[in-house]
Curated annotation (Swiss-Prot):
PROSITE patterns tied to this protein: SAM_MT_UBIE (PS51608), UBIE_1 (PS01183), UBIE_2 (PS01184)
Family label: Belongs to the class I-like SAM-binding methyltransferase superfamily. MenG/UbiE family.
GO MF, one annotated term: 2-methoxy-6-polyprenyl-1,4-benzoquinol methyltransferase activity
Described function: Methyltransferase required for the conversion of demethylmenaquinol (DMKH2) to menaquinol (MKH2) and the conversion of 2-polyprenyl-6-methoxy-1,4-benzoquinol (DDMQH2) to 2-polyprenyl-3-methyl-6-methoxy-1,4-benzoquinol (DMQH2).
Keyword tRNA-binding: no
Protein name per UniProt: Ubiquinone/menaquinone biosynthesis C-methyltransferase UbiE
Gene3D superfamilies xrefs: Vaccinia Virus protein VP39
Highest rank taxon of the organism: Bacteria
Pathway field: Quinol/quinone metabolism; menaquinone biosynthesis; menaquinol from 1,4-dihydroxy-2-naphthoate: step 2/2; Cofactor biosynthesis; ubiquinone biosynthesis
Biased composition (Basic and acidic residues): 1-12
Keyword vocabulary terms for this entry: Menaquinone biosynthesis, Methyltransferase, S-adenosyl-L-methionine, Transferase, Ubiquinone biosynthesis
Catalytic reaction annotation: a 2-demethylmenaquinol + S-adenosyl-L-methionine = a menaquinol + S-adenosyl-L-homocysteine + H(+); a 2-methoxy-6-(all-trans-polyprenyl)benzene-1,4-diol + S-adenosyl-L-methionine = a 5-methoxy-2-methyl-3-(all-trans-polyprenyl)benzene-1,4-diol + S-adenosyl-L-homocysteine + H(+)
Gene behind the chain: ubiE
Length: 256
């Protein structure tokens, strides 16, 4: 029944972690989280994953099939881990676009890669995954690592990624997922809701952002659901690979 105080046009809500918030507010709240943690994002990734995030990303790159001369889009590219590696793979005849909706994360990534001297074939673009500002059929490969769970309309973002890919192009989605056994799931819950906020407090003086991280992982679609979303968007040959007992999964789809 419609609440008469809200009228017939109440704004739809979505989840921000375990909270329900108006859709128009989620992007702002996510931006605040990443603005808070941007400076120490890489350090926290190493601490929270025990360095495993580097192996997960390496496997994703291996699955991508990126080679010299390719054009690659790395969405939610943050501090540039994937972009730096793709830059070497595509070489001087290729191009990497590092896109992120968050200005603070984009600045950290740009400064980091410029300092390392690997930004010659990398373009930095502030962009919304749901409305990618690129031409149709433009990229050989699109990646998004640990970013899709923060997107308000995931289905729209996946369709946008399909649009900008060339026929035969690959989408790789690396994201936290659902552990494949109960024992690991219980241990992971204890770790996520106790250690992660504590580490956030000690290292970044921000426990709430890492509590959101734990909650956002639980609200993200599981492996089969995300696979179905990619198929529904129009991708062919969609597969996924579980890593670390399903704590993380990488999905791959091909544009027909």
């Amino acid at each position: 029944m419609t609440d008469p105080r809200k009228g017939d046009h109440a704004e739809p809500t979505t989840h921000f972690g375990y909270q329900d918030v108006p859709e128009s507010q989620k992007a702002k709240k996510v931006a605040e989280v990443f603005h808070s943690v941007a400076a120490k994002y890489d350090l926290m990734n190493d601490v929270l994953s025990g360095g495993m995030h580097r192996l997960w990303k390496r496997f994703t790159i291996e699955l991508s099939g990126v080679r010299s001369g390719n054009r690659v889009l790395d969405i939610a590219g943050g501090t540039g881990d994937l972009a730096a590696k793709f830059s070497r793979l595509v070489g001087p005849t290729g191009q990497v676009v590092l896109a992120d909706i968050n200005e603070s994360m984009l600045k950290v990534g740009r400064d980091r890669l410029l300092d390392r001297g690997v930004a010659g074939n990398i373009e930095f673009v502030q962009a919304d995954a749901e409305k990618l500002p690129f031409p149709d059929n433009h990229f050989d490969c699109v990646t998004i690592a640990f970013g899709l769970r923060n997107v308000t309309h995931k289905d729209e973002a996946i369709r946008s990624m399909l649009r900008v890919l060339k026929p035969g192009g690959r989408l790789l989605v690396l994201e936290f997922s659902k552990p494949t056994n109960k024992l690991m799931s219980k241990a992971y819950d204890a770790y996520s809701f106790a250690f992660m906020p504590l580490a956030g407090k000690l290292i970044t003086n921000d426990s709430e952002s890492y509590r959101y991280l734990a909650e956002s992982i639980r609200m993200h679609p599981d492996q089969e659901t995300l696979k179905a979303m990619m198929v529904e968007a129009g991708f062919d040959r969609v597969t996924y690979h579980n890593m670390t007992s399903g704590i993380v999964a990488v999905h791959r789809g091909i544009k027909p």
